[in-house]
UniProtKB/Swiss-Prot annotation:
Pathway: Amino-acid biosynthesis; glycine biosynthesis. GO terms for biological process: fatty acid alpha-oxidation; glycine biosynthetic process; glycolate catabolic process; response to oxidative stress. Its cofactor is FMN. This is 2-Hydroxyacid oxidase 1. The modification Phosphoserine is found at S194, S230. The gene is Hao1. Its EC number is 1.1.3.15, 1.2.3.5. The modification N6-succinyllysine is found at K184. Broad substrate specificity (S)-2-hydroxy-acid oxidase that preferentially oxidizes glycolate. The glyoxylate produced by the oxidation of glycolate can then be utilized by alanine-glyoxylate aminotransferase for the peroxisomal synthesis of glycine; this pathway appears to be an important step for the detoxification of glyoxylate which, if allowed to accumulate, may be metabolized to oxalate with formation of kidney stones. Can also catalyze the oxidation glyoxylate, and long chain hydroxyacids such as 2-hydroxyhexadecanoate and 2-hydroxyoctanoate. It comes from Mus musculus (Mouse). A motif (Microbody targeting signal) lies at residues 368-370.
Amino acid sequence: MLPRLVCISDYEQHVRSVLQKSVYDYYRSGANDQETLADNIQAFSRWKLYPRMLRNVADIDLSTSVLGQRVSMPICVGATAMQCMAHVDGELATVRACQTMGTGMMLSSWATSSIEEVAEAGPEALRWMQLYIYKDREISRQIVKRAEKQGYKAIFVTVDTPYLGNRIDDVRNRFKLPPQLRMKNFETNDLAFSPKGNFGDNSGLAEYVAQAIDPSLSWDDITWLRRLTSLPIVVKGILRGDDAKEAVKHGVDGILVSNHGARQLDGVPATIDVLPEIVEAVEGKVEVFLDGGVRKGTDVLKALALGAKAVFVGRPIIWGLAFQGEKGVQDVLEILKEEFRLAMALSGCQNVKVIDKTLVRKNPLAVSKI
């Protein structure tokens, strides 16, 4: 009999004993001492909720829009690579769950299911494409054009990975893809991170990034991407107000406040702590989103109160996927949705439009660990 899992931490605790160690470590771990990994979650507790009373909350509307597309709730699925390591159906199970739940999924360029396969599995799902800028720009261009053709609604370009962060668990485990898997958006063994490729004796993914991803990425590449596609462009990985302003100048449609799940530069702030700076910097000109550390419905409420249009979740989706495939992903999303609904009701919020910064204040006694 399967255990009864009722919150996100239950899922992570359970799948730790289910997944192969190197796979679990890959999904779970952060960079270096993992200070930011812990802080991403702990930071939410530094922001306290100040609920409104005597509001009619008999009916709660969670729906909102992301880049002009309607979603049932401001909880979306972030780009998590190589999901077939967690479950045989991988990204196909995830997109089907998103389709059922009426929310959006960002597909990783490094998926173990192709752009086309995911579109076929979730034809009615709201899908976005995550993009890395490769040394060979033609590779990135083809990913964008394939995503356009298959009905993906936006491009989320990752800008925080000129090199891969020092993920010590991956180095210890000499992380590589299992022999039966490959990144299915690429043809050659080297680009597909195939076990047949040569990726050294340490973290194979770090070697892959060093070989393939362009460390000379600059704002000129955002201009190039803007000329390449008419799809909305979201810059993923911004943590400073001046970078946010520069992104707006370069014509992006959104900013995803992200520290890559604490997997790149350890010691950066938790995303919830820098969110207000980014929201202030863009002056309402583009939509702002957040990922990193979202584990509860109250986390979602706090992020929206501080100005995020929606949040993206990554690891919780993997834990649900590893537990029970499509159903596990759907159950995780249902848990977050119902927790968020309750948090809204107990805060006096009938819909997401009335969620504002008066609902949260930073605890003056709380001191960040970063």
